[in-house]
A protein has these predicted regions:
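Helix-coil boundary/capping segments in enzymes
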Residues: 1-171
Length: 171
């Protein structure tokens, strides 16, 4: 359902057979520097386009892909704990919304990856947030129970109408 494709030397995601432009660089390498949008979220006093602010980039730091490196940064910053919330896992539900079975597979697959790579409660300091979709309520309930059994303390859901086999439902 999510595949890598290369077009004109750049990698992109193909989601449900459709080219995704949700993220300009889904490899995240290089990535915009931390705080790149600070002025934008403080009222954008210079009236800059947010895409312009994201052009200052750096190589992908290890702390963005390795939980032990992230834990070291958390400790260096004097933080007790952090939450991790997904981006692409939630974004891609929109592209798959017409295929409830694919949305369910995306949700389950994402949560297994998250648990394996980051954990839902890694050393009581990094709390990965599993993703739930209500497209299939029975599957969502089973997945929530599984996530809670694995130590999840938070969840995340797409803030939009839910698409079911009978069409959209208001949240």
């Amino acid at each position: 359902m999510v595949q890598w494709v290369e077009i004109d030397g750049r990698r992109h995601h193909l989601v449900g057979g459709r080219l995704s432009h949700a993220v300009a660089n889904p490899t995240w390498n290089p990535i915009a520097k931390p705080g790149a949008l600070h002025s934008y979220f403080r009222g954008n006093p210079d009236g800059k386009n947010p895409l312009e602010l994201l052009k200052d980039r750096e190589p992908l730091p290890a702390a963005y892909v390795d939980r032990d490196a992230r834990l070291a940064v958390v400790q260096e910053q004097g933080l007790e704990a952090v939450w991790l919330f997904p981006t692409l896992g939630v974004l891609y539900e929109e592209l798959l919304k017409d295929d409830v079975e694919a949305v369910g597979a995306l949700m389950v697959g994402f949560n297994r990856w998250l648990l394996e790579d980051w954990g839902f409660d890694y050393r009581d300091a990094i709390f990965g947030s599993p993703y739930l979709s209500l497209a299939d309520v029975d599957l969502a309930v089973a997945e929530l129970e599984w996530c809670l059994d694995q130590g999840a303390r938070t969840i995340v859901m797409r803030p939009a109408a839910v698409w079911t086999v009978t069409g959209p439902r208001s949240p």
